[in-house]
Design a protein with these regions (language model features):
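Gly/Pro/Ser/Thr-rich low-complexity, intrinsically disordered segments predominantly at protein N-termini
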Residues: 1-204
């Protein structure tokens, strides 16, 4: 395990300043109204990140396998009163964002979210599986941190490690720890330390 100091966690949101014409940012309410009205009912798949519509990336077989392994590992660890969600929207009002992370540990049962999406107060952990999306997933840490997501994992398939971001602040996560093959990742849900997950159980 290696520890990264806060000075090494300088992540920032995308800067659209190079675009030569004005951009329009959607509010979260506007985006949700568009979804409800069927604007995105075609083949296009988007989610809202920092007020912008961002196309969702297609998952290859390696990504899909790591996603399933991670879901199985988390499902065998979390306590009663929580559940693991897969590629479902979460709502981050303060960041005008409604991403759909690969995995999310949310409070309560599946049926609790029939008419709403989990918000940061409902969420213990967000996980993104990263291969070609590694740079974007690292930048997205800034949104998760500012929005109040307690812990963010990046399952980094490029370097075969899991990056664990914690201690969120408006400027980003204050802590990052990297876990490598042969190590185990401690799992904390709702402030309670649970058993660890072996990295080898997550990486394909």
């Amino acid at each position: 395990m290696s520890t990264i100091t806060p000075s090494e966690l300088k992540t920032s949101l995308a800067d659209p300043g190079w675009i030569p014409w004005p951009l329009y940012r959607l509010t979260l309410d506007q985006y949700e109204a568009m979804v409800a009205s069927g604007v995105f009912s075609g083949r296009e798949r988007f989610h809202l990140i920092n007020g912008f519509l961002v196309a969702k990336m297609t998952k290859n077989d390696l990504h899909a396998t790591a996603d399933e392994l991670c879901g199985d590992a988390l499902g065998g660890t979390i306590p009663d009163g929580w559940h693991v969600r897969a590629a479902k929207p979460i709502r981050i009002p303060s960041q005008a964002s409604k991403p759909e992370p690969d995995r999310c540990v949310a409070r309560g049962s599946i049926r609790d979210y029939l008419q709403r999406s989990p918000e940061p107060t409902d969420i213990a952990l967000v996980v993104e599986i990263s291969d070609s999306s590694l740079s974007e997933d690292r930048k997205q840490a800034a949104i998760y941190a500012a929005g109040g997501i307690p812990v963010y994992w990046i399952v980094n398939l490029v370097d075969r490690q899991v990056e664990v971001y914690s201690d969120p602040s408006p400027l980003g996560y204050r802590s990052r720890q990297d876990y490598h093959a042969g190590e185990s990742i401690p799992v904390s849900i709702g402030g309670n330390q649970l058993s660890s997950i072996a990295l080898n159980d997550i990486l394909p």
